[in-house]
Amino acid sequence: MNIIEGKLIGQSLKFGITIGRFNEFIGGKLLDGAVDALIRHGVDEKDIEIAWVPGAFEIPLIAKKMAKSKKYDGIICLGAVIRGATTHYDYVASEVSKGIAKITLDEEVPVIFGVLTTENIEQAIERAGTKAGNKGYEAACTAIEMANIINII
């Protein structure tokens, strides 16, 4: 039996990050966590490229362009969609998650979903570096592991 597992070793890997500017006070914390994780696991700062987009809905397009470029071992998608008083949240959260999943399958590049979808601002704050850890950090670790698995297979 051969077991394939990715390692959290980022040396010689290159990552693209696309992040929504809307709810930037949350997204910025996710970005800090992601960059921290990449550097702590050996990714050179010059091998991290960050693209800011207006909001979460725009993330999949830039993630797709990054994936198609074949310059990156993985793409990390960050942002925050917080439920408000209208149904806008439902549409944005659904389309962003579907878009990111489709890119991963179509382009065969790890495209990691690090977009918070929360019921309220408190939940978003908790997941951006307080009680529930930093989901940006976790997304970056997932990207490193997946990039290493892809390189093994």
Curated annotation (Swiss-Prot):
This protein's pathway reads:
Cofactor biosynthesis; riboflavin biosynthesis; riboflavin from 2-hydroxy-3-oxobutyl phosphate and 5-amino-6-(D-ribitylamino)uracil: step 1/2
State the EC number(s): 2.5.1.78
A GO biological process this protein is involved in? Answer: riboflavin biosynthetic process
- Show the catalytic activity: (2S)-2-hydroxy-3-oxobutyl phosphate + 5-amino-6-(D-ribitylamino)uracil = 6,7-dimethyl-8-(1-D-ribityl)lumazine + phosphate + 2 H2O + H(+)
At the top level, the lineage of the source is Bacteria
Binding, 5-amino-6-(D-ribitylamino)uracil = 22, 56-58, 80-82, 113
Coiled-coil positions? none
Where on this chain does (2S)-2-hydroxy-3-oxobutyl phosphate bind? 85-86, 127
Q: Which UniProt keyword terms apply here?
A: Riboflavin biosynthesis, Transferase
Residues at the active site = 88 (proton donor)
Query: Short name of one Pfam family for this protein?
Result: DMRL_synthase
Question: What are the protein's GO molecular function terms?
Answer: 6,7-dimethyl-8-ribityllumazine synthase activity
Entry's Gene Ontology cellular component terms = cytosol; riboflavin synthase complex
Instruction: Report the sequence similarity comment from the record.
Output: Belongs to the DMRL synthase family.
Q: What does this protein do?
A: Catalyzes the formation of 6,7-dimethyl-8-ribityllumazine by condensation of 5-amino-6-(D-ribitylamino)uracil with 3,4-dihydroxy-2-butanone 4-phosphate. This is the penultimate step in the biosynthesis of riboflavin.
HAMAP family from the xrefs? Answer: Lumazine_synth
Q: Which NCBIfam families match?
A: lumazine-synth, PRK00061.1-4
Name the UniProt record assigns to this protein: 6,7-dimethyl-8-ribityllumazine synthase
Q: Which organism is it from?
A: Clostridium tetani (strain Massachusetts / E88)
